[in-house]
Every structure is written in C-alpha cells, then in structure tokens.
C-alpha cells in the first residue's frame, strides 16, 4: 500500500503588508468584501464600503498598525511565521505552510507550496480555537474554491475547533499563572474574545458556546471561583448588536465600581495582533484606568511558545 505524505496548513486571518493607508485599504477591501464577514446586501454594502468605510478607516487604522509594527512586519505575521517555523522544526518530516484568508501569504499559495512538496494529504489547522462562520467558515470556503480549480485534489483533514483541547487549556492556564506570579493575583481575570454580530449566533453560529466552554475549562484548570473570571467580547464593528457584554464597556463599569486590579487575556487569539496589542493592551487599559481602576495587565497570546507549538503538534497528530 502506498504511503501517504502529509502536509500541515496553518491558517489565520491576515494582515496588511505595510502600515500605510494604501496597504490597509487593500487589506480591508478584501476582508470586508467576504460575505462570511459581512453578509449585508451587496447593493447596500458596496457603496458604503467603497465610498465611506475604506476612505475614512484606512488612514486611521494605518496609524494604529504603525504603533505596533515590528521589524519583521505586523505582529500577526511575525508570530505566525515563528509558529510555522517552530512547528516545522518540531515535525521535521512534515511540510508546514502558512496561509491567510486575506492578504499575503494567501491560502492558495500555501496549498500550492504543499502540493509542490508532493503531499497527498493536508491537515488544515485554522488558528481559531473557537469556531465561527466568520473565521473558520471563511477558511473552509476559500479552501473549497482553491481545490475546485485543481485536477487532482489531496485528502483533507480540517480541524474545526479546539476550544476545550486539554493541551490548549493547560497552555492558557500556565500563561495566566506566570502573569499572576509576576504581577500578583488580580481582583478579576477578564477573558476577552473577538465578537461577532448577535444575529450570526441567533442563526446557528455556535461561537458563543465555544467561548463559554473555554472560559469554563480555563477557570477550572486555574481553580478560580466563577465570580473572579469574566467573559466579554471586543472589536465590534457597525451598528447592529454584537455578542455582549462588550469588553470596553465592562472595563469602564468595573473601574467605576472600584475594582482595582484586572488582568486581561484573549484566549481566542493564537497570535498577538492589532486587536490585542493596541485595542486591549493600550486602548482598554486607558478605559479601565480612566474609570478609576488602579492596575491593569494584558496577558500575551500563546504565540510561538514551546507549549503552544507542542499543542499544535499534538493536535495535528491525530490526523496525520
């Protein structure tokens, strides 16, 4: 029987190529054109996107990217490349490619890279622990479009989510413990997840359940009382209701109520990016301290830590 050669495709959202209005505009146009992300009628959405959102948001968002840009590129790209390289070192016999839903490197370039290595089976690992149609679903859609153009397609194993994976929860717990040891145990551990429109959940997206699962399992691993762990949702966009409670409003309320010390972790982000390093670590710090809070720390994403890479290796092992 012929031996199967397996490759691994790490997938994430994507990032602009540069912290400039032009690069951000290109990225946002591709991102916000995906029906998985914004499903508004195209007749209504296109004029709003092209005539209002892109011209107004691109310069402002470019400045935010510039504030966190690293020598090797955006934080998401730097940490994603580190993850790819570390996993390849951990699994030296297995090709590992990196692809983004939007921007570069594309998912198509990642598939082609693996096919050039003569793999006949690809394990796709979207680096979103909690499934959502707007993230994991977008990877699935693009992968299907890519393979529809191939005469010969490889076998595909697609990891839908890993919200309660034992290694993932332990890696998060150890990261929290290290932060507590460094800064002292806070009055409250706030777990902030990227939000989605409430309507998506109402229509069947089980993302909120996955977030609750991760929150419950992490609190259990840390042996923390339920009242000392809170789950919120960040990064809302547009006017329709998103999952609640909102992170920024919650931090303001907690500061006003006299909560003195908070530490914030974003368990849904496998790599630090604009939404964690600027929105959570900077903007929301100001919100909390400005409302009367005394001490605020952001706990970094797992990024390319050895525990995170080992988790990835163990996760894909079941599909190789």
From Swiss-Prot:
Instruction: List the NCBIfam families hit by this protein, alphabetically.
Output: hemH
The main place the protein resides is cytoplasm
Annotated GO biological processes are: heme biosynthetic process
Per the UniProt entry, the Enzyme Commission number(s) are 4.98.1.1
Catalytic activity, as annotated: heme b + 2 H(+) = protoporphyrin IX + Fe(2+)
**Family assignment?**
Belongs to the ferrochelatase family.
Where in or outside the cell it occurs: the entry states: Cytoplasm
Recorded hits in InterPro entries, A to Z, give: Ferrochelatase (IPR001015), Ferrochelatase_AS (IPR019772), Ferrochelatase_C (IPR033644), Ferrochelatase_N (IPR033659)
Name the Pfam families on file. Ferrochelatase (PF00762)
Which GO-annotated molecular functions does the record name? ferrochelatase activity; metal ion binding
Assembly description: Monomer.
List the CDD domains: Ferrochelatase_C (cd00419), Ferrochelatase_N (cd03411)
User: Which PROSITE patterns does the UniProt entry name for this protein?
Assistant: FERROCHELATASE
Which gene name belongs to this protein?
Answer: hemH
Where, in this chain's numbering, is Fe cation bound?
Answer: 194, 275
| UniProt keywords, alphabetically | Cytoplasm, Heme biosynthesis, Iron, Lyase, Metal-binding, Porphyrin biosynthesis
GO CC aspect terms? cytoplasm
Q: What is this protein called?
A: Ferrochelatase
Q: Which pathway is this protein assigned to? A: Porphyrin-containing compound metabolism; protoheme biosynthesis; protoheme from protoporphyrin-IX: step 1/1
Q: What does this protein do?
A: Catalyzes the ferrous insertion into protoporphyrin IX.
